[in-house]
């Protein structure tokens, strides 16, 4: 027998069903009315915003064009200013080089005099004296510097002005590069449109970047750079005109000073050669005396060794005779003779040691004095070498630099040749 299956769920009343249908129909009408209102407002908003967007884009495009024109005008002014600045730098550089060429004839004697003074600073010990040569060299430096002072001042001013011009040039180049980059960026912005492939949304594009300036600051900066460049170019032109001068010839004065200096060099070299020869003679005699004294010391040492062997023999004999038995241990003539021999040998050894000590003291004194002689000889050789180098260097004052070849042996002042071993040793000492 079949049974009725009833779904266990809530059962609504019929009025509830009618009410739900009415609410759905009413809400649908209300939603359509609201949607119609929104659609009308959206159409109005679209028209207004489209018009505003088109106008804003056109207005900003016009502003970009005007800004590009303004930046381009400043760029052209900077171009002209940079061209004039380059020309002025070249002109001032040429004038500076011309002034330096006028000093060239004085630079060589000055360099030679300073080189001689520097070389003579390598003198050692007692040879570091303030002699007439040093006085003449200092006087030579003073004479040369006096003739260079006025023109050197202009050269220094030209150098400083060139530094200022280059600083201005660097500033103008920086400003010019900035305007070139700005033109490239603004022209790129002007070329963009709605169909450009590289447009996208950015994060906070309306921010004000650090270091932003006002339009007035921008204009003042460019105008300041231009005005400063023009002022520096005017100063450079005046300096070029002031630098156009001549230096009075001082060849006679410089030649007279050169002759006086070289005369002092020759006189000083003759003095040192005389002293050097005397010291070498003393060294030779001292070396001979040292050799003889060393030979005598060797003989004394040999005698000491011989006497010591004799003393050992006597000691051994005496010691051996102390072992004689009983009454045989008597003080006989042999005992007295051996005892006297020991005493005599001890006295002899003491005398030889004393004389050996005196000889060694004398040898030490001779060696120390020889060292002092050789040190002074080395000083003299060094001083002669330095002054001869100075004389050789000063040949550049009378021989053109391109033809100058040192032809003097810096020790003997003869033509270059292979030095003997003795002279090579002397040079090493120097």
Curated annotation (Swiss-Prot):
Statement: the UniProt record of this protein carries the keyword Signal: no
Official protein name in the record: Tektin-2
Example GO BP: cilium movement involved in cell motility
Coiled-coil segments on the chain, per record: 80-162, 225-382
Expression (tissue specificity): Expressed at high levels in testis, trachea and fetal lung, and at lower levels in ovary, pituitary, adult lung, fetal brain and fetal kidney.
Organism: Homo sapiens (Human)
Subunit structure: Microtubule inner protein component of sperm flagellar doublet microtubules. May interact with CCDC172.
Post-translational modification: Tyrosine phosphorylated. Ubiquitinated, leading to its degradation. Deubiquitinated by USP16, promoting its stability.
UniProt keywords, alphabetically: Cell projection, Cilium, Cilium biogenesis/degradation, Coiled coil, Cytoplasm, Cytoskeleton, Flagellum, Microtubule, Phosphoprotein, Ubl conjugation
Record's subcellular location: Cytoplasm, Cytoskeleton, Cilium axoneme; Cytoplasm, Cytoskeleton, Flagellum axoneme; Cytoplasm, Cytoskeleton, Microtubule organizing center
Assigned protein family: Belongs to the tektin family.
Xref: InterPro entries: Tektin-like, Tektins
UniProt GO cellular component terms: axonemal A tubule inner sheath; axonemal microtubule; microtubule cytoskeleton; microtubule organizing center; nucleus; sperm flagellum
């Amino acid at each position: 027998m079949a049974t009725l299956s009833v779904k266990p769920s809530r059962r609504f009343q019929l009025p509830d069903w009618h009410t739900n249908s009415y609410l759905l129909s009413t809400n649908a009408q209300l939603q359509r009315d609201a949607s119609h209102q929104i659609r009308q407002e959206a159409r109005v908003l679209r028209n207004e915003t489209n018009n505003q967007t088109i106008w804003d884009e056109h207005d900003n495009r016009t502003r970009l064009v005007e800004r590009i024109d303004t930046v381009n005008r400043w760029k052209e002014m900077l171009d002209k200013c940079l061209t004039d600045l380059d020309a002025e730098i070249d002109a001032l550089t040429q004038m500076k080089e011309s002034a330096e060429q006028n000093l060239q004839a004085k630079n060589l004697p000055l360099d030679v005099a300073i080189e001689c003074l520097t070389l003579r600073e390598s003198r050692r010990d007692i040879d570091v004296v303030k002699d007439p040569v040093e006085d003449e060299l200092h006087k030579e430096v003073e004479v040369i510097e006096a003739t260079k002072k006025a023109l050197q001042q202009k050269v220094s001013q030209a150098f400083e002005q060139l530094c200022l011009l280059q600083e201005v040039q660097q500033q103008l180049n920086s400003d010019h590069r900035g305007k070139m980059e700005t033109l490239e960026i603004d022209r790129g912005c002007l070329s963009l449109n709605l169909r450009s492939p590289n447009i996208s949304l950015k994060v906070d594009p309306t921010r004000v970047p650090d270091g932003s300036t006002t339009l007035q600051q921008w204009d003042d900066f460019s105008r300041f750079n231009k005005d400063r460049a023009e002022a520096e170019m005017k100063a450079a032109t005046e300096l070029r005109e002031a630098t156009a001068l001549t230096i009075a010839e001082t060849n006679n004065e410089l030649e007279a000073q050169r002759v006086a200096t070289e005369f002092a060099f020759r006189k000083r070299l003759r003095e040192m050669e005389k002293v050097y020869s005397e010291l070498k003679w003393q060294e030779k005699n001292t070396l001979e005396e040292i050799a003889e004294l060393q030979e005598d010391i060797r003989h004394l040492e040999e005698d000491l060794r011989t006497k010591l062997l004799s003393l050992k023999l006597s000691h051994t004999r005496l010691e051996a005779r102390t072992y004689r038995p009983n009454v045989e241990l008597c003080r006989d003539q042999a005992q007295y003779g051996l005892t006297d021999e020991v005493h005599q040998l001890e006295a002899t050894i003491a005398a030889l040691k004393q004389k050996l000590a005196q000889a060694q003291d004398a040898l030490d004194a001779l060696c120390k004095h020889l060292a002092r002689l050789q040190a002074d000889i080395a000083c003299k050789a060094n001083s002669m070498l330095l002054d001869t180098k100075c004389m050789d260097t000063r040949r550049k004052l009378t021989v053109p630099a391109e033809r100058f070849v040192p032809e003097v042996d810096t020790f003997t002042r003869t033509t270059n040749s292979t030095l003997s071993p003795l002279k090579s040793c002397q040079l090493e000492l120097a």
